[in-house]
Amino acid sequence: MLARRRFLQFSGAAVASSLALPLLARAAGKTAASAPTDAALTAATDFAALEKAVRGRFGVTLLDTASGRRIGHRQDERFPMCSTFKSVLAATVLSQAERQPALLDTRVPVRDADLLSHAPVTRRHAGKDMTVRDLCRATIITSDNTAANLLFGVVGGPPAVTAFLRSIGDAVSRTDRLEPELNSFAKGDPRDTTTPAAMAATLQRVVLGEVLQLASRQQLADWLIDNETGDACLRAGLGKLWRVRDKTGSNGEDARNDIAVLWPVAGGAPWVLTAYLQAGAISYEQRATVLAQVGRIADRLIG
């Protein structure tokens, strides 16, 4: 409760730019001693300083689901979703399955022509078929791109996912193309983008809200907690006080993202953390280190 009170006090106040802390040393693994209140006072400026240190563009939202308050950096700017869209794609499938009970067990052919370069699960099933349920699991847990495209075919294409987003109150996020084209991004092009704030609200709705039935929410949460691609990202910076359900995304060029629902092990309301990074001046592995640092900043504030 102390951490949540600190967060509420901080998120309702403006933070002057003079409070910014240099984050370059911290990103390399060093820490600075600070009182609990210091963590609250410096979180937003820490995010901005981290962005400056990596010479990129960085958006983050930390949402307290108990109060609706949030803090972050560039929360309302558009970023390419990359594979973080797959959480919403799976939610779209689950929503349709609530009206079509046999959908998750429907078998979908996996053709050689369907296979993309990142197809760790579907490649093993080429020439055979997979259930929609197994395709969802593959695209969330291993970020299998072929599975994602096959699921687009199941639900009605990218426009159907955007329609689902609009139906649950997300007027910002959108899916327009298939893998791998959806990963390309140019400034001013809204295709296949979201904002940190919009995705935080959407993740809250589909995992914690009532837009999906309880069984569907539990299924989505189970897939997210089994995710195999996020250990070096937000999870790496969050302490053992949290059970993390997340979905990562990257484009292999400059973007690396991670979105997560954080459940306190000790109980209490969850938090949602979304982080979108564009930093072409650093390596793929270094981008993961930046996301881990975001986890540390969040953990310092709410842990």
From Swiss-Prot:
One MF annotation (Gene Ontology) recorded for this entry: beta-lactamase activity
Catalytic activity: a beta-lactam + H2O = a substituted beta-amino acid
UniProt GO BP: beta-lactam antibiotic catabolic process; response to antibiotic
Enzyme Commission (EC) number: 3.5.2.6
Enzyme class: hydrolase
Binding site for substrate: 247-249
PTM section of the record: Predicted to be exported by the Tat system. The position of the signal peptide cleavage has not been experimentally proven.
Key words of the record: Antibiotic resistance, Hydrolase, Signal
Signal peptide (residue range): 1-35
Sequence similarity: Belongs to the class-A beta-lactamase family.
Misc. comment: The class A beta-lactamase family has a specific amino-acid numbering system, sometimes called Ambler or ABL numbering and often misspelt as Amber. A multiple sequence alignment was used to derive a consensus sequence and then the consensus was numbered taking into account insertions and deletions. This allows use of identical numbers, e.g. for active site residues, despite differences in protein length. UniProt always uses natural numbering of residues, hence there appear to be differences in numbering between this entry and some papers.
Protein name in the entry: Beta-lactamase L2
Organism: Stenotrophomonas maltophilia
